[in-house]
């Protein structure tokens, strides 16, 4: 059994080296005693909410008002019957305000929280299968439910405690989860939750019966691990929002067409071809145009003979591993890019963007000879080859010429691949008959 909280929270006694007497503890610059001494006394009625406020207004519960008191909601770690309900209003008045424990168990700072480590409720308050015991712990843990952590801050909450304890699930976006201050152990009291949260905990931690005192170490590790991951994600989001809000490098270069803001003129220059449609960097092998020289250099690898990355399913080889990863989506049937208008899915993001232009109905690139319009400028560039009879890509089987290598491959796949496969089937049937 753990020691009483008064023993745990007693100040450390230092012995004098010469006299052997207990030396007075060294006063810290930011000790709890000094913090509490500099603040005003809390108002009477520590758990009284402001009843006269309008709906939606914030109700302040005065539990040690000078110190942000963070009390997470923690589910029972025991085998709980789903039908075992508890009158949490009565539990709140009896256990937290110390009517059962006596005045000696109350906090020395008059915050109204029962600091007694071991206390029992009457049988009328504790149904069978429930163990009502607040756990004093030195770390703030949150009950994980569907990837979320639920906290309850008595200082910055607009919810009355009985409403919360009667089973109201509060998302982290509704609750102000303030950073922990250096508090004594009793300010981190865990309140036992109702059967709804207990059922969620049972699903997440499917363990058999275990002692009625504390959580298993594996469960604490699991909760702390998820709590750390949530903190990291929150920090990354906060950093991203801070950068977008102008706290970082100022973004002063704005695109006059779409209003997008950039932090350097070079980035704005690279962005402008998106609106002008200019693709000045053209591949000499296939004629495909690019907005940036770096993209052209990366594209040139396609035309080399070396293809070290092979697909394990079909044996097709690729120049780059990223192209292989995109190709694997075809075998898996994975189309992550879905059109918002028609629901059509695509394996590649580029094809998805090109498809979305068909829904806009805007074809700003027109041919000066036949007035045929296109969504993208490189389609117009390839279309111009039809007027000057320039078809650099020729089919080796039938001799038909094409303006793009893509059209040549599509032609071979639709016509000649079927013919070759049918011929091979005929040869196999002839050998079988002979």
From Swiss-Prot:
Motif (Engrailed homology 1 repressor): 27-42
Name used for this protein in its record: Fez family zinc finger protein 2
SUPFAM superfamilies: beta-beta-alpha zinc fingers (SSF57667)
Entry similarity comment: Belongs to the krueppel C2H2-type zinc-finger protein family.
Source domain of life: Eukaryota
Role description: Transcription repressor. Component of the regulatory cascade that controls the development of dopaminergic (DA) and serotonergic (5HT) neurons.
Pfam families in the record: zf-C2H2 (PF00096), zf-C2H2_6 (PF13912)
Compartment(s) of residence: Nucleus
GO molecular function list: DNA-binding transcription factor activity; DNA-binding transcription factor activity, RNA polymerase II-specific; RNA polymerase II cis-regulatory region sequence-specific DNA binding; zinc ion binding
Alphabetical list of Gene3D superfamilies matching this protein: Classic Zinc Finger (3.30.160.60)
A GO CC term attached to the entry: nucleus
Keywords: Developmental protein, Differentiation, DNA-binding, Metal-binding, Neurogenesis, Nucleus, Repeat, Repressor, Transcription, Transcription regulation, Zinc, Zinc-finger
Originating species: Xenopus laevis
Example GO BP: nervous system development
Zinc finger annotations (C2H2-type) as residue ranges: 253-275, 281-303, 309-331, 337-359, 365-387, 393-416
């Amino acid at each position: 059994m753990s020691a009483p909280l008064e023993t745990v929270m007693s100040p450390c006694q230092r012995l004098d080296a010469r006299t052997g007497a207990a030396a007075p503890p060294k006063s810290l610059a930011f000790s709890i005693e000094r913090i509490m001494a500099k603040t005003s006394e809390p108002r009477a009625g520590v758990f009284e909410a402001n009843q006269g406020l309008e709906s939606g207004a914030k109700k302040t519960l005065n539990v040690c008002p000078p110190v942000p008191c963070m009390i997470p909601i923690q589910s029972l770690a025991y085998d709980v019957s789903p039908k075992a309900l508890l009158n949490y209003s009565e539990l709140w008045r009896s256990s937290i305000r110390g009517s059962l424990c006596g005045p000696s168990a109350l906090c020395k700072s008059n915050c109204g929280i029962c600091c007694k480590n071991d206390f029992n409720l009457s049988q009328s308050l504790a149904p069978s299968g429930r163990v009502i015991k607040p756990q004093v712990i030195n770390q703030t843990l949150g009950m994980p439910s569907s990837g979320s952590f639920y906290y309850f801050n008595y200082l910055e909450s607009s919810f009355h405690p009985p409403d919360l304890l009667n089973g109201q699930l509060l998302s982290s976006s509704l609750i102000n989860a303030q950073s922990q201050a250096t508090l004594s152990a009793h300010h981190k009291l865990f309140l036992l939750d109702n059967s709804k949260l207990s059922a969620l905990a049972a699903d997440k931690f499917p363990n058999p019966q275990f002692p009625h005192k504390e959580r298993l170490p594996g469960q604490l590790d699991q909760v702390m691990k998820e709590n750390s991951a949530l903190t990291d994600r929150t920090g990354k989001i906060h950093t991203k929002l801070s950068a977008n809000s102008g706290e970082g490098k100022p973004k002063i270069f704005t695109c006059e067409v779409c209003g997008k803001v950039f932090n350097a003129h070079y980035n704005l220059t690279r962005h402008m071809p998106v609106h002008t449609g200019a693709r000045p960097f053209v591949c000499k092998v296939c004629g495909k145009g690019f907005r940036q020289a770096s993209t052209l250099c990366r594209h040139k690898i396609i035309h080399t003979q070396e293809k070290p990355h092979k697909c394990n399913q079909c044996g097709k080889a690729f120049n780059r591993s990223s192209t292989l990863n995109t190709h694997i989506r075809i075998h898996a049937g994975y189309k992550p890019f879905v059109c918002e208008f028609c629901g059509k899915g695509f394996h590649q993001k580029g094809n998805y963007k090109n498809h979305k232009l068909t829904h806009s109905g805007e074809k700003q690139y027109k041919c000066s000879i036949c007035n045929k319009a296109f969504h993208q400028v490189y389609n117009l560039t390839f279309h111009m080859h039809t007027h000057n009879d320039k078809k650099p890509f020729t089919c080796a089987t039938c001799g038909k010429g094409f303006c793009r290598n893509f059209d040549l491959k599509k032609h071979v796949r639709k016509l000649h691949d079927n013919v070759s496969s049918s011929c091979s089937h005929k040869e196999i049937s002839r050998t079988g008959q002979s």
